[in-house]
């Protein structure tokens, strides 16, 4: 599967953009700054909307879990960094984000969204794209939701853990795999060890 210039198994498109960092400061960051770490890079349509804060807060609240497995979560939308900051400074009870534990990237020229294939051109906003990029900068997973439905932090965390497991051990992860579950040796004979345990 490919999406814009984002192709599974290929280097993820690099970007350089201004982000609002967890300390509330503006900083120019690029994807290459995170080489050596896994990255969950997700797009959302707009600041000050309805589903978006639920997703962003959910990822931010669990940023430490991702950090523990050497993974950085980064959010992005087409809004300006000033708009991001205003939303962060708006209380949660008023639809704001409150303090963030993840950077929020500003993509006002829509070049990053276009590069990653998530730009909804007729509205100039991003679909809910999510990209898992490994520690070598290779794109491993793409999901894109239409605007009305949010994403699962649990599933994203599971996918990062599964890719990290396969990278380290060379075994493959069956459907619904979670850390500690059985994996499959990718060999006709050795795979029977896994399948023989199935009901």
UniProtKB/Swiss-Prot annotation:
Cell compartment(s), UniProt: Cytoplasm
Entry-linked Pfam families: 1-cysPrx_C (PF10417), AhpC-TSA (PF00578)
GO molecular function term, any single one: identical protein binding
Tissue specificity statement from the Swiss-Prot or TrEMBL entry: Detected in heart and skeletal muscle (at protein level).
Record domain Thioredoxin: where: 6-165
Listed name of the protein: Peroxiredoxin-1
PANTHER family for this protein: PEROXIREDOXIN-1 (PTHR10681:SF111), THIOREDOXIN PEROXIDASE (PTHR10681)
Modified residues (Phosphothreonine): 90
EC number: 1.11.1.24
Segments of this protein annotated with the region Disordered: 176-199
Phosphoserine modification, residue list: 32
TM annotation in the entry: none
Record SUPFAM superfamilies: Thioredoxin-like (SSF52833)
Note: The active site is a conserved redox-active cysteine residue, the peroxidatic cysteine (C(P)), which makes the nucleophilic attack on the peroxide substrate. The peroxide oxidizes the C(P)-SH to cysteine sulfenic acid (C(P)-SOH), which then reacts with another cysteine residue, the resolving cysteine (C(R)), to form a disulfide bridge. The disulfide is subsequently reduced by an appropriate electron donor to complete the catalytic cycle. In this typical 2-Cys peroxiredoxin, C(R) is provided by the other dimeric subunit to form an intersubunit disulfide.
Catalysed reactions listed for this entry: a hydroperoxide + [thioredoxin]-dithiol = an alcohol + [thioredoxin]-disulfide + H2O
